[in-house]
Amino acid sequence: PDAARTALAEAGYDGEPLRLMLPPPAYARRGGEIVASQLRAVGIETEIQNLEWAQWLEQVFRGKDYDLTIVSHTEPADINIYARPDYYFQYDNPEFQALMVEITGTSDPAMRSEMLKRAQRIIADDHVNAYLFQLAKTGVANAGIQGLWENAPTQANDLTGVSWSE
């Protein structure tokens, strides 16, 4: 905490409280409590505002009126949202946008993989968002089904490799 307080002072942080706007899911509400506590520990007063989905969509997503929020972005190819400067977190990096156009026009899997690694590095280096945790995915399936992912990285189920065992 001391190093963080020093860094904040060096950056000229004026002590302005932050508004942490949280949608209804438990991961957001509980995560918000933890984040606010950690920020307070280094001297950043954080006001939690629990919103209903309609309020979150109107104020945060459409209105872009927030300081901090927690929301799950786990859709396939979600990285494309970072190439949209009008998206709610308003990230605007022309280098990243050009790279995403290049990725879209590339069909070679190895080249796409390398380009996506570069894109992820840009996002990480620019500190666009903080990645707090991987959502737990709980599921129940018939023992005769094979090919379902365990600990899948997205909320959707990829059924292309699923079949009934004999």
Where are these regions (language model features)?
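Extracytoplasmic/periplasmic, Sec-exported soluble proteins
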Residues: 23-31, 48, 52, 71, ...
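Short, solvent-exposed loop/beta-turn-alpha elements that line the ligand-binding surface or hinge
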Residues: 1-2, 60-65, 81-107, 135-166
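Hydrophobic anchor at the start of a short beta-strand
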Residues: 18, 46, 130
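Append "and occasionally in soluble cytosolic enzymes with long acidic Gly/Pro-rich linkers
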Residues: 1-37, 92, 118, 122, ...
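Periplasmic binding protein-like
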Residues: 30-31, 37-86, 115-116
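Solvent-exposed loop/turn segments at secondary-structure junctions
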Residues: 24-28, 53-55, 73-77, 121-122, ...
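C-terminal amphipathic alpha-helical "assembly" element
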Residues: 36-47, 137, 146, 157
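Sec-exported extracytoplasmic/periplasmic mature domains
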Residues: 9-14, 37-44, 61-65, 74, ...
